[in-house]
UniProtKB/Swiss-Prot annotation:
<keyword id="KW-1003">Cell membrane</keyword>
<protein>
    <recommendedName>
        <fullName>UPF0299 membrane protein YohJ</fullName>
    </recommendedName>
</protein>
<keyword id="KW-0472">Membrane</keyword>
<keyword id="KW-0812">Transmembrane</keyword>
<feature type="topological domain" description="Periplasmic">
    <location>
        <begin position="1"/>
        <end position="6"/>
    </location>
</feature>
<feature type="topological domain" description="Cytoplasmic">
    <location>
        <begin position="28"/>
        <end position="30"/>
    </location>
</feature>
<keyword id="KW-1133">Transmembrane helix</keyword>
<keyword id="KW-0997">Cell inner membrane</keyword>
<feature type="transmembrane region" description="Helical">
    <location>
        <begin position="93"/>
        <end position="113"/>
    </location>
</feature>
<feature type="topological domain" description="Cytoplasmic">
    <location>
        <begin position="84"/>
        <end position="92"/>
    </location>
</feature>
<feature type="topological domain" description="Periplasmic">
    <location>
        <begin position="114"/>
        <end position="132"/>
    </location>
</feature>
<comment type="similarity">
    <text>Belongs to the UPF0299 family.</text>
</comment>
<dbReference type="InterPro" id="IPR005538">
    <property type="entry name" value="LrgA/CidA"/>
</dbReference>
<feature type="transmembrane region" description="Helical">
    <location>
        <begin position="31"/>
        <end position="51"/>
    </location>
</feature>
<feature type="transmembrane region" description="Helical">
    <location>
        <begin position="7"/>
        <end position="27"/>
    </location>
</feature>
<dbReference type="InterPro" id="IPR022957">
    <property type="entry name" value="Uncharacterised_UPF0299"/>
</dbReference>
<feature type="transmembrane region" description="Helical">
    <location>
        <begin position="63"/>
        <end position="83"/>
    </location>
</feature>
Length: 132
């Protein structure tokens, strides 16, 4: 019985911590003069707490595993909600596709530049000497 209670406690603790970060993010979003979704701020709060090791990762792992396991199911309501605006999406299909393509390219360039900035130029494995 003690093992079962321990497992239940781990799941409850994980979800309480995840939701505490979410609601802290929602609260901070309501105070900020710019529009940033509270869920994004909550994720950043959780990331900072984990990165600074203020919050041990083992405390949130059980809840994260459950959320990741059922992630596809969690997108179903969002897909149904988007279908309510099908006519609007069909009318704006071109601009949506163009903005998605451009933003994807911008992300590729920024990640590539950041990676080169952080890691510097390294010799590729199997590559002979480079001419400079």
């Amino acid at each position: 019985m003690s093992k079962s209670l321990n497992i239940i406690w781990q799941y409850i603790r994980a979800f309480v911590l995840i939701y505490a970060c979410l609601y802290a993010g929602i609260f901070l979003a309501s105070l900020l003069p710019i529009t940033i979704p509270g869920s994004i701020i909550g994720m950043l709060i959780l990331f900072v707490l984990l990165a600074l090791q203020i919050l041990p990762a083992k405390w949130v792992n059980p809840g994260c595993y459950v959320l990741i396991r059922y992630m596809a199911l969690l997108f179903v309501p969002i897909g149904v909600g988007v279908m309510q605006y099908f006519d609007l999406l069909r009318a704006q299909f071109g601009p949506v596709v163009v903005s998605c393509a451009i933003s994807t390219l911008v992300v590729f360039v920024v990640v590539s530049w950041s990676s080169h900035l952080i890691h510097g130029e390294r010799k590729v494995v199997g590559q002979k000497g480079t001419k400079k």
